[in-house]
Structure formats: structure tokens, C-alpha cells
């Protein structure tokens, strides 16, 4: 399971011209599910996202996690994160989970995060438009 996290001052995801999810300060989490993923990996990644220290403290050092910074999460499914780009000029998605497994683990990841923080979401498998203001910019690739 892969999470591309971006520290944002605002982020929004629209589906069919309507806002599906919107946050102020927090993390935009683009989430990709691989075929070998399971709930244990989703738990591990959720804990990592929630506890990863990417927000500045009083000395402007990255010592605070999203909860300590009183931020929110916007979680958006993005299967292209699991692409194999090592060969040729076209990505391969053979590492990706089936749509059923990906949807199940995407929803599970969101439920685990919602136990500890406010979470907004996109719509699984939809064509979405994501807008954000990346703060820093600060972007990290996390895997479980």
C-alpha cells in the first residue's frame, strides 16, 4: 500500500463538478492499493500517516504530526501510484489490487484514520479533479 502525502493549507476533490471532500490545513493523501495488500498493511500505513511528523513546531522544525497540528486528512484513491514504470513508455498496473480489494482496503484505511482524526474523501474509482495548495512544498512517499 502506498500513500503519497502532501502537507497542504487547503485541498479539495471534485467529482462530476461537485465537491466530494474539502479540507483546510492538513494532509492530502493519495492512496494506492497493491495486490498483496491486506488490513495489517492498511493499519500500519494509517498509523504512519497519522503520526508522520511533517508540521512545524514553535521552532519551525518538522516535529508535529497532523493531529498535533490540528489538521485534517483528505484521502483520494489513486491506482496510478502502484504502476510499474521501469520498462518501456507505458505504465503497467499488474501490481495493482483488483477493484474489489482496492475498494475494500481504501474504505478500511479511511475508517482507521477516522477513529483518530477528521477525514474527507474522494470517490473510489471516479474521475476526480483535485486542487490543493502544497505547503512548503512538503511531499512524502510512504509504503507499508
Swiss-Prot record:
Cellular component per GO? cytoplasm
Q: Its catalytic activity?
A: glycyl-tRNA(Ala) + H2O = tRNA(Ala) + glycine + H(+); a D-aminoacyl-tRNA + H2O = a tRNA + a D-alpha-amino acid + H(+)
**Gene3D superfamilies tied to this protein:** D-tyrosyl-tRNA(Tyr) deacylase (3.50.80.10)
Chief subcellular location equals cytoplasm
- Annotated membrane-spanning segments are none
EC class name: hydrolase
UniProt-listed CDD domains: Dtyr_deacylase
Organism domain of life: Bacteria
Q: Where in the cell is it found?
A: Cytoplasm
Q: Which GO terms describe its molecular function?
A: D-tyrosyl-tRNA(Tyr) deacylase activity; Gly-tRNA(Ala) deacylase activity; Ser(Gly)-tRNA(Ala) hydrolase activity; tRNA binding
The record's keywords, sorted A to Z, are: Cytoplasm, Hydrolase, RNA-binding, tRNA-binding
Q: Where is this motif: Gly-cisPro motif, important for rejection of L-amino acids?
A: 136-137
In short, the EC number is: 3.1.1.96
Gene Ontology BP annotations: D-amino acid catabolic process
Q: What does this protein do?
A: An aminoacyl-tRNA editing enzyme that deacylates mischarged D-aminoacyl-tRNAs. Also deacylates mischarged glycyl-tRNA(Ala), protecting cells against glycine mischarging by AlaRS. Acts via tRNA-based rather than protein-based catalysis; rejects L-amino acids rather than detecting D-amino acids in the active site. By recycling D-aminoacyl-tRNA to D-amino acids and free tRNA molecules, this enzyme counteracts the toxicity associated with the formation of D-aminoacyl-tRNA entities in vivo and helps enforce protein L-homochirality.
Q: Which family does the record assign?
A: Belongs to the DTD family.
Q: How does it assemble?
A: Homodimer.
Free-text comment on this protein's domains from its UniProt entry = A Gly-cisPro motif from one monomer fits into the active site of the other monomer to allow specific chiral rejection of L-amino acids.
Which protein is depicted?
D-aminoacyl-tRNA deacylase
Report the source organism: Actinobacillus succinogenes (strain ATCC 55618 / DSM 22257 / CCUG 43843 / 130Z)
Source organism phylogeny: Bacteria, Pseudomonadati, Pseudomonadota, Gammaproteobacteria, Pasteurellales
